[in-house]
């Protein structure tokens, strides 16, 4: 058996149908998901991460200012430990450092990365550091949407959408494992209104791929882990040239083989696939696929190599088989009903 922890939206302001942080038991032989727990603590347990030993889980509560910690029990269900208020509005992403010392949270309207101390019992402690993306005017911020480690967990890539009062950008930040503070080593500014959203790092730690939400683009960057420098090399559309309707790029992943990049698009409800040149890192589109649902806000690869898409507005998680030789997605017809899913973490 394996397990999946599914975050969701729960509030009427989000027109959500989610009930809470859900735990599913997965039969590895049949692929069937069984709901074993739905934990109701704070609203909108939207994005999650685990500690390095997979004994604890941490969740942000989207649209609010809170972050929660949970112990993963022997039966893989969750026990709530504590919830803290970090002050920054709308935490949207969360990760943990390689020493299990600090939890890092990105806040959208807060425009700030928060470093939170992690106690010995796995619960959350005080905020140890804060790093803010300045806006166009004093008192304004650039809205951060992700905090992503490089493969060595020495640098953090943090995308900011910018929106009206800020600057659309992605920064590379060197991390101090001792203090939990960040030092900028590189910065990329996007075109106005393109809104950088999420990035993914190739296993070789030299190539980074970033999707822009409103620009509907995927960009390729070269990254130097010795200096922290990065350089934009290429951009491609995440939707076919025949698509003229509204679309928002939402998630980007490198497949487990390191051969392909995938990007999901909301409203056009599709997944774009790109082959990675194994020598140069440049991308070439190989196809577009229906996500078989509405609003694919999130997708990821499970340990078994299957791709799971969280379709927020159709209340489903859809399983696909991914052929790493051809880059094709094949629906398995395994569809898991769950309210307003926006994140999946496997254990």
Q: What would you call each of these model-derived segments?
A:
Residues 24-31, 70-77, 115-125, 172-181, ...:
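Short loop/turn segments immediately following beta-strands, especially the blade-tip
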Residues 17, 44-46, 90, 143, ...:
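Beta-rich catalytic cores
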Residues 247-280, 284-312:
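Loop/turn-rich, solvent-exposed surfaces of beta-rich toroidal or solenoidal domains
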Residues 6-9, 14-15, 59-62, 105-108, ...:
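Conserved beta-strand positions in repeat-built beta-propeller and related beta-rich domains
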Residues 34-40, 79-85, 128-137, 183-190, ...:
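A short beta-strand motif characteristic of beta-propeller blades
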